[in-house]
Amino acid sequence: MIEADRLIAPENPAFRDEDVIDRAIRPKKLADYQGQDHVRDQMEIFIKAAQLRNEALDHLLIFGPPGLGKTTLANIVANEMGVNIRTTSGPVLEKAGDLAALLTNLEENDVLFIDEIHRLSPMVEEVLYPAMEDYQLDIMIGEGPAARSIKIDLPPFTLIGATTRAGSLTSPLRDRFGITQRLEYYKIPDLQNIVQRSADCLGLSMEAEGALEVARRARGTPRIANRLLRRVRDFAEVKGNGHICADTADKALNMLDVDSKGFDYMDRKLLLAIMEKFGGGPVGLDNMAAAIGEEKDTIEDVLEPYLIQQGYLQRTPRGRIATDRAYLHFGIEK
């Protein structure tokens, strides 16, 4: 798997120890939430309306590519509502009892955040339906003919589900969310503001041009931007005086093999394979996976989304095609 050694992979277990730093620099209020203006403006209205009625916020589904701030937004919502948040994930909730234990410990208007909600088991999902709709918990007591169902009333609460695969949610679950928000890849000016804010939180000396250089190569993803910032900081402290300007950021990121478009060696390997081995395509996923020695799921979920979003790769019914922009980037004649 390539995730373990990709600095620009949005989800990389190798960087879990940096979650503590990420939590320290995450915004706590909607006013500090950079980018995603449509989401921020809508959530501000929904939250204020719920507060005016003294009600729990409607259940909220947040979806989009990894690293765009779904967990951050969930925590901001709880903070703005002035309530507690309990966090879990779909794979952790193996049994109905696991979910029941969380639900029965919620206080009025609290937030329950379930990351990777598309990975809930059908058994757990069935328990969630009446909890979301009627604030009730249906529990089976006993087994066989003696089994009986009892109902437990729950306080009003807000379920916030996060997923990178909204299409994998079942219709009954998806339809029970009153609010749905899609997070998009960030624009460079918004990422620059995020990098500058993170640098200030970390006490770094950073010029606006240095923040811009990091933002350009962060693939539209705040998580990657903050990770690159930390590595640029290391470079500046060892090779310079700790001050980060555009030149320092450029040298650091080139050393890390992250080019001007945010591509690393795996992105280049994939695009070059299509252009040089398959004449630019179309090429099927199986052939492409064999050509670069990577799993199909990794290509589809990790490598392709950004390349497609930026216009370097196309998915067609006949296979993948490298675009004119890809040829231009590598200086290869078509």
Swiss-Prot record:
Belongs to the RuvB family. It is found in: Cytoplasm. Mg(2+) binds at residue 71. Residues 4-186 are annotated as: Large ATPase domain (RuvB-L). Keywords: ATP-binding, Cytoplasm, DNA damage, DNA recombination, DNA repair, DNA-binding, Hydrolase, Nucleotide-binding. It comes from Vibrio vulnificus (strain YJ016). Residues 187-257 are annotated as: Small ATPAse domain (RuvB-S). It is an enzyme of class 3 (hydrolase). GO terms for molecular function: ATP binding; ATP hydrolysis activity; four-way junction DNA binding; four-way junction helicase activity. GO terms for cellular component: cytoplasm; Holliday junction resolvase complex. This is Holliday junction branch migration complex subunit RuvB. Homohexamer. Forms an RuvA(8)-RuvB(12)-Holliday junction (HJ) complex. HJ DNA is sandwiched between 2 RuvA tetramers; dsDNA enters through RuvA and exits via RuvB. An RuvB hexamer assembles on each DNA strand where it exits the tetramer. Each RuvB hexamer is contacted by two RuvA subunits (via domain III) on 2 adjacent RuvB subunits; this complex drives branch migration. In the full resolvosome a probable DNA-RuvA(4)-RuvB(12)-RuvC(2) complex forms which resolves the HJ. It holds the Pfam family RuvB_C. InterPro entries: AAA+_ATPase, AAA_lid_4, DNA_helicase_Holl-junc_RuvB, P-loop_NTPase, RuvB-like_N, RuvB_C, WH-like_DNA-bd_sf, WH_DNA-bd_sf. The RuvA-RuvB-RuvC complex processes Holliday junction (HJ) DNA during genetic recombination and DNA repair, while the RuvA-RuvB complex plays an important role in the rescue of blocked DNA replication forks via replication fork reversal (RFR). RuvA specifically binds to HJ cruciform DNA, conferring on it an open structure. The RuvB hexamer acts as an ATP-dependent pump, pulling dsDNA into and through the RuvAB complex. RuvB forms 2 homohexamers on either side of HJ DNA bound by 1 or 2 RuvA tetramers; 4 subunits per hexamer contact DNA at a time. Has 3 domains, the large (RuvB-L) and small ATPase (RuvB-S) domains and the C-terminal head (RuvB-H) domain. The head domain binds DNA, while the ATPase domains jointly bind ATP, ADP or are empty depending on the state of the subunit in the translocation cycle. During a single DNA translocation step the structure of each domain remains the same, but their relative positions change. ATP binds at residues 25-26, 67, 70-72, 133-135, 176, 186, 223. NCBIfam families: PRK00080.1, ruvB. Its EC number is 3.6.4.-. It catalyses: ATP + H2O = ADP + phosphate + H(+). GO terms for biological process: DNA recombination; DNA repair. DNA binds at residues 315, 320. Gene3D superfamilies: 1.10.8.60, P-loop containing nucleotide triphosphate hydrolases (3.40.50.300), Winged helix-like DNA-binding domain superfamily/Winged helix DNA-binding domain (1.10.10.10). Residues 260-334 are annotated as: Head domain (RuvB-H).
